[in-house]
From Swiss-Prot:
GO terms for molecular function: structural constituent of ribosome. Disulfide bonds: none annotated. GO terms for cellular component: ribonucleoprotein complex; ribosome. Belongs to the eukaryotic ribosomal protein eL39 family. The keyword Coiled coil does not apply. Gene3D superfamilies: Ribosomal protein L39e. Keywords: Ribonucleoprotein, Ribosomal protein. InterPro entries: Ribosomal_eL39, Ribosomal_eL39_CS, Ribosomal_eL39_dom_sf. This is Large ribosomal subunit protein eL39. The keyword NADP does not apply. It comes from Methanococcoides burtonii (strain DSM 6242 / NBRC 107633 / OCM 468 / ACE-M).
Length: 51
């Protein structure tokens, strides 16, 4: 992937943004009911279907 198109970069950026952990304030606000992120993606285990 040497040359990414603009659309591809935008989709990669979105995937990167979605892959962040649950914010601390959410954990505190929900009294630790929401701690994990079920859609979290590991770069080596799961592949991205970016076109």
């Amino acid at each position: 992937m040497s040359h990414n198109t603009k659309g591809q970069k935008i989709r990669l950026a979105k995937a990167h943004n979605q892959n962040q952990r649950v914010p601390t304030w959410v954990i505190i606000k929900t009294n630790r009911k929401v701690v994990s992120h079920p859609k979290r993606r590991h770069w080596r285990r799961n592949s991205l279907d970016v076109k």
